[in-house]
Regions:
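Short, solvent-exposed loop/beta-turn-alpha elements that line the ligand-binding surface or hinge
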Residues: 46-51, 132-148, 231-252, 299-312, ...
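N-terminal secretory signal peptides and thylakoid transit peptides that target proteins
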Residues: 1-18
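Extracytoplasmic/periplasmic solute-binding protein
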Residues: 153-166, 171, 196-242, 248, ...
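Extracytoplasmic "Venus flytrap"/periplasmic binding protein-like
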Residues: 74-146, 178-190, 278, 282-286, ...
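Hinge/lid segment of periplasmic solute-binding proteins
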Residues: 32-50, 117-172, 196, 309-315
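Glycine-centered hinge/linker elements that transmit conformational signals in sensory
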Residues: 198-205, 239-268, 313, 317
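C-terminal lobe and pocket-closing loops
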Residues: 41-43, 48-50, 119, 292-308, ...
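Conserved C-terminal helix/tail region of periplasmic/extracytoplasmic solute-binding proteins
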Residues: 33-38, 42, 50-51, 86-87, ...
Length: 453
């Protein structure tokens, strides 16, 4: 993630509008070489008779590494060249994407397709075009969907696809190898007490850790969820009853309050670029993040930053009391709104992006920034060419999701969007609330969405 997050990039990729003489049904055009390391079945694509005069408007999250946008733009331009359908793509800052999605959904106007956040489709399901035809085709062709992709793409406990996960963003531990060794560790411990000791020692040697406890869409929610799950706590139980009022949540809050003492000051104000900047500046030695930090350092012309990349390692977040390392991968989730005049063109655009000639290079060049929702893409060679990418490979092969361990619903989305859990941790860590009072506040807010038991 980079300092360019607040910059809104807009690119209109031209192409002649479809003529009035008639619009063909588009098949599976392969305008780029198909990657040879993506296993695929011979499956006939669904046929979408594209609407006359179709033109699309799309919004998606702003990039944190250049290839994410560069290859998205290349693929979009290729789609226009192949089909004649012009597509306008707007790249929206992470903080603004949810509000803009809400406006589009509530006004019934604006972008045809929103590549939005993980569970937001559950808020707007009645306003979305179903995706079963696309999901079934892609799943059959590319080895099936990872379970977490199915959870985010389908109505809870049904086979109805309301959205299509495009790629998951995960946040494993990112750390400086030499500084962690200086603190007495060869790797990041899974035991929470040992992890606390490591962070304390990093602070003592002048290289503190740093985790966002502010309103950072990805980083803060990811850290707060880890803190809950690693201590055996959860927002709701499997039946969807709010379960925050527990001894496990108290333990999680006390743990983060102690950990906060060893963090660099100011993490309460960090957005999703805060830890990136601090790490690249050499101000912190450990954080949780996507691959963007490593990617920027590795590809910098600055020898100092290149040396930092060599001294950087990734590892799954500490397991603590969880069944396995409690890391999720929140996907960028494609939503096609019913107000679109060109739903078939929109579906064809999404299908085109997910096919191997387009998706393979985009995924590989993003270098772990996004993790694949379709199993065949996990076979691509780039995942094993750099061992430092290992924690990002198969990141969507996880049991953890927003709202774990309950149903994924509009309530789960609202809790995340309103930073209910993040604010609970922040209040205790900064000394503005006791664990018990912070839990009461969080429970009241969560019950506004989930209802009372």
């Amino acid at each position: 993630m980079t300092s360019g997050i607040s910059r809104r990039d807009s690119l209109i990729l031209g192409g002649a509008a479809l003529g009035a003489a008639g619009v063909p049904i588009i098949g599976a055009h392969a305008q780029a070489p198909t990657p040879t390391d993506v296993p695929m079945a011979d499956v006939k694509p669904p046929q979408f008779p594209v609407e006359k005069g179709a033109a699309l408007h799309v919004i998606r999250p702003a990039k944190f590494i250049d290839p994410d946008q560069v290859y998205w733009d290349i693929n979009t331009k290729r789609f226009t060249q192949t089909t004649g359908i012009p597509v306008a793509v707007n790249y929206i800052s992470w903080e603004d994407l949810r509000p803009q999605t809400a406006v589009i959904a509530n006004t019934g106007a604006g972008a045809d397709v929103v590549f939005g956040w993980a569970i937001d489709p559950f808020l707007y399901e009645t306003k979305l075009v179903g995706m079963n035809d696309l999901a079934e085709y892609l799943g059959k062709k590319y080895g099936g969907w990872f379970d977490i992709a199915k959870l985010y793409g389908t109505r809870w406990k049904t086979n109805y696809w309301h959205s299509l996960p495009i790629g998951g963003g995960s946040g494993p531990t990112v750390y400086r190898i030499s500084w962690v060794k200086q603190a007495g560790y060869d790797r990041i411990p899974d035991n929470l007490d040992d992890f606390m000791t490591l962070c304390r020692k990093l602070k003592q040697i002048g290289h503190p850790c740093g985790f966002s406890i502010g309103h950072a869409v990805g980083d803060a929610n990811g850290f707060a969820e880890w803190a809950l799950w690693a201590n055996g706590a959860q927002v709701v139980d499997p039946e969807g009853r709010v379960a925050l009022d527990s001894k496990e949540t108290v333990a999680a809050l006390k743990y983060v309050a102690e950990l906060y003492k060893y963090m660099i000051p100011g993490t309460i104000a960090w957005n999703d670029s805060g830890n990136n900047k601090a790490y690249a500046a050499g101000d912190i030695g450990l954080t949780f993040n996507g691959v963007s930090i490593y990617y920027v350092l590795k590809n910098s012309p600055d020898p100092t930053l290149q040396a930092m990349a060599k001294d950087t390692m990734h590892q799954a977040v500490p397991q603590g009391l969880a069944k396995r390392s409690p890391m999720t991968a929140g996907p960028m989730n494609a939503m096609l709104f019913k107000h679109s005049k060109y739903p078939n063109a929109a579906k064809e655009y999404i299908r085109f992006l997910m096919e191997a000639p387009q998706y393979g290079p985009w995924l590989a060049k993003c270098y772990g920034y996004w993790s694949e929702p379709l199993k065949s893409y996990a076979k691509m060679k780039f995942w094993t060419e750099d061992p430092k990418l290992a924690p990002y490979a198969n990141a969507m092969d996880t049991i953890y999701y927003d709202g774990y361990a309950g149903p994924i619903t509009a309530a789960a989305s609202a809790v995340v969007a309103n930073y209910t859990v993040v604010d609970m941790f922040a209040a205790v860590a900064t000394g503005n609330a006791t664990p018990q009072s912070a839990i009461r506040t969080a429970v009241r807010e969560a019950e506004r969405y989930y209802g009372k038991a």
